[in-house]
From Swiss-Prot, chain A:
The gene is Il1rn. InterPro entries: IL-1_CS, IL-1_fam, IL-1RA/IL-36, IL1/FGF. Glycans are attached at N110. Belongs to the IL-1 family. Transmembrane segments: none annotated. Disulfide bonds join C92-C142. GO terms for cellular component: centrosome; cytosol; extracellular region; extracellular space; nucleoplasm; vesicle. Pfam families: IL1. This is Interleukin-1 receptor antagonist protein. The lineage of its organism: Eukaryota, Metazoa, Chordata, Craniata, Vertebrata.
Swiss-Prot record, chain B:
GO terms for molecular function: interleukin-1 binding; interleukin-1 receptor activity; interleukin-1, type II, blocking receptor activity. This is Interleukin-1 receptor type 2. Keywords: Cell membrane, Disulfide bond, Glycoprotein, Immunoglobulin domain, Membrane, Receptor, Repeat, Secreted, Signal, Transmembrane, Transmembrane helix. Residues 382-410 are cytoplasmic. It is a single-pass type I membrane protein. Glycans are attached at N124, N208, N231, N289. The gene is Il1r2. Associates with IL1RAP to form a non-signaling interleukin-1 receptor complex.
């Protein structure tokens, strides 16, 4: 009886292995490409960003001070929505509401942990719009409020709901960080 | 301490800068109300990250970071003093070229020996704080350019803008100060057609920026103090960014509707044309009902393929596939979108899955086919085993006949 079954059970096992192997080959291996990109950012008045007392400042950097410049990390969410961060996405820009007061904050959140579908992460979302070579960012959680710098140097980067104000700059240039 | 830090930050954030147009800088320094020993019971807040990098023979201002935009002198219960790290003397006492006004230390003119660390001490009734500011005074030579130049960027073929930086204190003190722009050693006067005045003398416009416009520029402001004129120079390195670096991505495929059989495996490539440039930072990804694929399908029924970049006939493409394994009825009602994005532009293309019933699907046929093969195999094996079993049965019969024969003689 054993002699009779032996060779055919081997064949059956081989067939099953082939099937599973075929199945395994269908699933692609390898890591998913990271969607975070680092950019050099400067406003239309040639000011760049740097940190002072854990606050994002816009100013003019010269000589060795240029190494203080903060690059912006951007993660696209949708066609025109992005998350913005610095320090490799470990600090994220967000719009904070306290009563009627609107403030730009830097929160210690990993940018890759943010999700568009979570309501609490909406404060980190910015709507990006291009006008010619420049880009502006409107907060999704605070509609009508735009990322801005002041004309005067060494003042904090903040949010404004009066983007046409002459002493306010809401337009930025980008360059991929090489 | 944390509350104090927040308070200082808050004060800094909400302070409104006042535009003061004083005719001349007051010569008399603010004398301290009581004798102070610097460093005594003061909280040291650290070093200001930005160093002050200036040229010798020119006026220099150091701004105390502790109260960067408030006028200290207006507060009757607080005052601010400056000292140099290697000296126990307060600044105004032993050096006529230096004086303090508000939160700003003036050095006019600066010499190379003024380089060093300066400490500002902010004191009021309740507390005392200190911070340090680094000053480096360079020789006014070409060798100093890399150390003092501001980096500014303009895009090719656009109207470029140069800004003469960090002149706020001098402009407010000397409103009629004249500013001249130079490229290298060449004065860019009003007759120059390529360079335009922006009205504001601290700005220079470059019409139709070209690669030749890159290089070192200088803006020089004349500053008058006590009847004597000084130059205030800012060096700027202009870099020209080529606009052709980043192409506008064009999504070539997929089609608006993709025919598929339910239960089948489906691969939909999103193919993006990137032009003929050397490199691109374009990223491509899929969305299902505006949700990332990995978030919409955590179990992996639908997955995103690898980012595949390649060239065909000197044209650059990037491809990311959407993989269904298998297609379900749910997919017929889902909006699938491929997005291509780079610093210059974002493009997207919608597509939907449409059921095709007539299409023969191998994966559907595979399961019953396997079953049939197994059944047929089993039957065939049984037949072979039955033959051998038949033989065995015959042998048994013979033995039975033998047993019957001996019993009959009895």
């Amino acid at each position: 009886m054993e002699i009779c079954w032996g060779p055919y059970s081997h064949l059956i096992s081989l067939l099953l292995i082939l099937l599973f192997h075929s199945e395994a080959a269908c699933r692609p291996s390898g890591k998913r490409p990271c969607k975070m990109q680092a950019f050099r950012i400067w406003d239309t008045n040639q000011k760049t960003f740097y940190l002072r007392n854990n606050q994002l400042i816009a100013g003019y950097l010269q000589g060795p001070n240029i190494k203080l410049e903060e690059k912006i990390d951007m993660v696209p969410i949708d066609l025109h929505s992005v998350f913005l961060g610095i320090h490799g996405g470990k600090l994220c820009l967000s719009c904070a509401k306290s009563g009627d007061d609107i403030k730009l904050q830097l929160e210690e959140v990993n940018i890759t942990d943010l999700s568009k579908n979570k309501e609490e992460d909406k404060r980190f979302t910015f709507i990006r719009s291009e006008k010619g070579p420049t880009t502006s960012f409107e907060s999704a959680a605070c509609p009508g409020w735009f990322l801005c710098t002041t004309l005067e140097a060494d003042r904090p980067v903040s949010l404004t709901n009066t983007p046409e104000e002459p002493l306010i700059v809401t337009k930025f240039y980008f360059q991929e960080d090489q | 301490m944390f509350i104090l830090l927040v308070l200082v930050t808050g004060v800094s954030a909400f302070t409104t800068p006042t535009v003061v147009h004083t005719g001349k800088v007051s010569e008399s320094p603010i004398t301290s109300e009581k004798p102070t020993v610097h460093g005594d019971n003061c909280q040291f807040r650290g070093r200001e990250f930005k160093s002050e990098l200036r040229l010798e023979g020119e006026p220099v201002v150091l701004r105390c970071p502790l109260a960067p935009h408030s006028d200290i002198s207006s507060s009757s219960h607080s005052f601010l003093t400056w000292s140099k790290l290697d000296s126990s003397q307060l600044i105004p006492r032993d050096e006529p070229r230096m004086w303090v006004k508000g939160n700003i230390l003036w050095i006019l003119p600066a010499v190379q020996q003024d380089s060093g660390t300066y400490i500002c001490t902010f004191r009021n009734a309740s507390h005392c704080e200190q911070m340090s500011v680094e000053l480096k005074v360079f020789k006014n030579t070409e060798a100093s350019l890399p150390h003092v130049s501001y980096l500014q960027i303009s895009a090719l073929s656009t109207t470029g803008l140069l800004v003469c930086p960090d002149l706020k204190e001098f402009i407010s003190s000397n409103a009629d100060g004249k500013i001249q722009w130079y490229k290298g050693a060449i004065l860019l006067d009003k007759g120059n057609k390529e360079f335009l005045s922006a009205g504001d003398p601290t700005r220079l416009l470059i019409s139709n920026t070209s690669m030749d416009d890159a290089g070192y520029y200088r803006c020089v402001m004349t500053f008058t103090y006590n009847g004597q004129e000084y130059n205030i120079t800012r060096n700027i390195e202009l870099r020209v960014k080529g606009t052709t670096t980043e192409p506008i991505p064009v999504i070539i495929s997929p089609l608006e509707t993709i025919p598929a059989s339910l239960g089948s495996r489906l691969i939909v490539p999103c193919k993006v044309f990137l032009g003929t440039g050397t490199s691109s930072n374009t990223i491509v990804w899929w969305l299902a009902n505006s949700t990332f694929i990995s978030a919409a399908y955590p179990r992996g029924r639908v997955t995103e393929g690898l980012h595949h970049q390649y060239s065909e006939n000197d044209e650059n493409y990037v491809e990311v596939s959407l993989i269904f394994d298998p297609v379900t009825r749910e997919d017929l009602h889902t909006d699938f979108k491929c997005v291509a994005s780079n610093p210059r532009s974002s493009q997207s293309l919608h597509t939907t899955v449409k059921e095709v019933s007539s299409t023969f699907s191998w994966s559907i046929a595979l399961a019953p086919l396997s079953l049939i093969i197994l059944v047929v195999g089993a039957i065939w094996m049984r037949r072979r085993c039955k033959r051998r079993a038949g033989k065995t049965y015959g042998l048994t019969k013979l033995r039975t006949d033998n047993q019957d024969f001996p019993s009959s003689p009895n």
